[in-house]
A protein has these predicted regions:
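C-terminal outer-membrane/trafficking sorting elements
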Residues: 166-206
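A broad "non-catalytic interaction surface" signal
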Residues: 1-162
Length: 206
């Protein structure tokens, strides 16, 4: 008996959908990040927007801007990525926490741009990302818990390997002879895998 239970719950293949009220402007009028541009989305039915058909690639270890617009100020925002694909959102999956759009403001259009970083060891592949807002209070730790005013929206992200090259790899690059004698050069590098090289002359021509 009693009401004790897990902090998160899910059904097969579905995340929980807390019912929130965004009818007077709370929540998200738009969310833009990566290749996703969900502008003028308005208030979702029952305060939950399933936009998982919209997807973008995000790279391990990289930092991204997310631009958000609301129709009512003092929106506290949290975001999770379901890295283990269990349809629950847990504390170790939070990528954006307690960002406030239009702090201290009331009705009207308010925008904000936050940043979030993908962990360097994030699981590759497709995952859900959830953005949740709550008016004048932090988003509950339990992502299934409803607040009076706010909205929840879900999208899909595809985690890919970072394409960056470290400074150490660059320092280990060796090209000889220098100056070039004839048409042949030797390039030594600690970078494994395929390499792409462009050669320019002193005037900047390829």
């Amino acid at each position: 008996g009693g009401n004790d239970g897990p902090d998160q719950w899910s059904t097969l293949g579905l995340t929980c959908q807390p019912a929130l009220n965004c009818t007077v402007g709370d929540g998200f009028n738009s969310i833009v990040f990566g290749d996703i541009d969900n502008s003028d989305s308005g208030c979702s039915a029952n305060g939950f927007g399933n936009f998982t058909d919209l997807s973008t690639d995000l790279a391990q270890g990289d930092t991204y801007d997310v631009s958000m617009e609301t129709g009512y100020g003092d929106q506290h925002v949290r975001a999770w990525i379901d890295f283990n694909d269990d349809y629950n959102y847990t504390a170790d999956e939070i990528v954006l926490d307690n960002y406030i759009i239009g702090e201290g403001q009331g009705s009207g259009t308010h925008t904000g741009t936050a940043q979030f970083t993908i962990p360097a060891d994030a699981t590759l592949g497709s995952h859900y990302i959830r953005f949740a807002s709550a008016w004048q209070t932090g988003v509950p730790d339990n992502p299934c818990e409803a607040t009076s005013w706010g909205e929840t929206e879900e999208y899909t992200v595809n985690i890919v390997e970072s394409l960056g090259i470290s400074d150490v790899d660059l320092l280990n690059l060796r090209i000889y002879p220098n100056p070039v004698d004839g048409n042949n050069v030797t390039i030594l590098s600690s970078v494994s895998g395929d390499k792409f090289v462009e050669v320019f002359d002193i005037n900047g021509r390829k």
